[in-house]
Amino acid sequence: MRAFQVVEFASPIVPRDIPDPQPRASDVLVEVASCGLCHTDVHLQQGYISLGGDRKLPVSMTGLHTPATLGHEIFGHIMAFGPSSGLTAADVGRPVIVYPWIGCGHCAACLADRDNECPMPQSLGWQRPGGHGERVLVRDAKFLIDAEGLNSDAGIYACCGLTGYAALNKIVRRDGPIGIIGVGGVGLMALSIAKAMSLGPIVAMDIDAAKLMLARQSYGAELSFDTRSGNVGEQIQQATGGLIGVVDFVGAQQTVDLAVSVLRTGGTYVNVGLFGGALQTPLAILAQRQLVLRGSYVGTPAELRELVALARGGRLRAIPIQNEPMDSINEGLTRLRAGKVTGRIVHTHRQVTATQG
């Protein structure tokens, strides 16, 4: 099969012919139709995650080694399976979304269906080959979400959607305005999900005027603010009286400082972004204002199933999708790295076209 692989960090991804994976035991082989492109792919391809300043975490320390097949927003069809998978011939060809955040299968987190908290992750597109290959091996059928009736862009729910849904679930209070920092693909999806969950009013924050306009006019954000404004925190406080929750999809120094400054007493800050910020709020302030600080990393298999149910029920507004061939993966990474993508890029493998449900 053909796979698009990182052979050398910070260099273009290369198409290579590699052996087809063979399912054994409980394995399921999925033929990949499409795979969404994520900022995590940008970090992994460059070879490090920024920790702020000059500090960097090499991705080799997280279990990714070259040659690596990235891609974790996977939509495909069941192709083959191992003898203890629990599947039958009737399942072959069934459309599925793949939950990629697979754990070791043995620790307390995995046994409690919280694979995303596993200390020894085996995530597809990271520690294990992902959807930038034409076929992907999934350890167990429980990580396959039925996608009947959904179109082939639905793989984005496995990260772009799940990341926002799980982060919103971590906000403690639900009785006031909620801020979303960064309204790119994940932020717009989170906005759509927040509306489906009857949260809000929603305050959108970004540095891109076009994205803010889209968030307000098409996705229901009641207010929007350009975070480059020198007094944006004061503007938000005056307009809302403070926010009960902020989800930060950027994670830069400026965004964490802004988020903490606009929270009400008892508010929740949820950080998702990986752009190198550091928390510098005095501990006395945390205590006096009774703030809740949470990190959020994707979500559980159960949360993905809940999210897909929302989508199937027609309660989510689709985000802008740019369907492109997998051969253009490097161009997509360049645009995403430069912040030139509104919504999501979804790459399709050769001889595979987007299917409508």
Q: For each predicted feature, which ranges?
A:
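Glycine-rich beta-strand-centered segment in the early N-terminal region that forms part
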Residues: 21-35, 50-106, 145-149
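Residues in the short beta-alpha loop(s) of Rossmann-like NAD(P)-binding domains
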Residues: 48, 208, 275, 299
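Mid-domain Rossmann-like dinucleotide-binding core that forms the NAD(H)/NADP(H) cofactor-binding site
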Residues: 92-95, 134, 148-229, 234
